[in-house]
Curated annotation (Swiss-Prot):
<keyword id="KW-0662">Pyridine nucleotide biosynthesis</keyword>
<keyword id="KW-0808">Transferase</keyword>
<keyword id="KW-0548">Nucleotidyltransferase</keyword>
<dbReference type="Pfam" id="PF01467">
    <property type="entry name" value="CTP_transf_like"/>
</dbReference>
<comment type="similarity">
    <text>Belongs to the NadD family.</text>
</comment>
<dbReference type="GO" id="GO:0005524">
    <property type="term" value="F:ATP binding"/>
</dbReference>
<dbReference type="InterPro" id="IPR005248">
    <property type="entry name" value="NadD/NMNAT"/>
</dbReference>
<dbReference type="GO" id="GO:0009435">
    <property type="term" value="P:NAD biosynthetic process"/>
</dbReference>
<keyword id="KW-0547">Nucleotide-binding</keyword>
<dbReference type="GO" id="GO:0004515">
    <property type="term" value="F:nicotinate-nucleotide adenylyltransferase activity"/>
</dbReference>
<dbReference type="InterPro" id="IPR014729">
    <property type="entry name" value="Rossmann-like_a/b/a_fold"/>
</dbReference>
<comment type="function">
    <text>Catalyzes the reversible adenylation of nicotinate mononucleotide (NaMN) to nicotinic acid adenine dinucleotide (NaAD).</text>
</comment>
<protein>
    <recommendedName>
        <fullName>Probable nicotinate-nucleotide adenylyltransferase</fullName>
        <ecNumber>2.7.7.18</ecNumber>
    </recommendedName>
</protein>
<keyword id="KW-0520">NAD</keyword>
<dbReference type="InterPro" id="IPR004821">
    <property type="entry name" value="Cyt_trans-like"/>
</dbReference>
<keyword id="KW-0067">ATP-binding</keyword>
<comment type="pathway">
    <text>Cofactor biosynthesis; NAD(+) biosynthesis; deamido-NAD(+) from nicotinate D-ribonucleotide: step 1/1.</text>
</comment>
Amino acid sequence: MRIGILGGTFDPIHFGHIRPAQEVKQTLNLDKVWLMPNHIPPHKTSTSVSTEQRLEMTQLVCDEYSEFELCAIEAKREAPSYLVTTLKQITNSHPNDEFFFIMGMDSLLSLDTWFEWQSLFGLCHIVVCQRPGWSLSPDSSIFSQYQSRVRSPNKITGKQSGLIIPIPVTPQAISSTHIREQLSEGITPTNALPDKIIQYIEDKNLYRT
């Protein structure tokens, strides 16, 4: 199987996560996209709601959209969530599958600061959600890696890992921070959240301060 993986805090999960993942799945003809909530992100100290609540919200999205599947491997780990550790565990248990880790451009630009980042290329392809008109600067610290590994979506056959695949996606002016701010002010961002997530947040009285 060809499986995309979208990791994130998902605090809360919203259309800014969902829509780009759907576009990536369609462009690459993936069988599934796993939504993988982090438990203890190395670069974040806390989240606004519990891990269990973020898992439940992510599961609601998977229930509504059949192309998604919940991956709880990081959320259930009682240690910092380093991607390379997670991918080693996943590829060991799914040796015949091809994995595509989905990230934004900001993550790509800081990739060389990630724990054992060069090992990622032996475990998966990296899909970069690309804003219109963007290109990587030659001054970037990962430019040489990018140049040697970048491929267009229609030229990725024959390799199970190691490529960087930029995919133009529709810009989404949505952020979890802004959603939390709106909710704390009593505003329900109906255009940013699926109905089931809105209902869950209201039922659990989340993000209200």
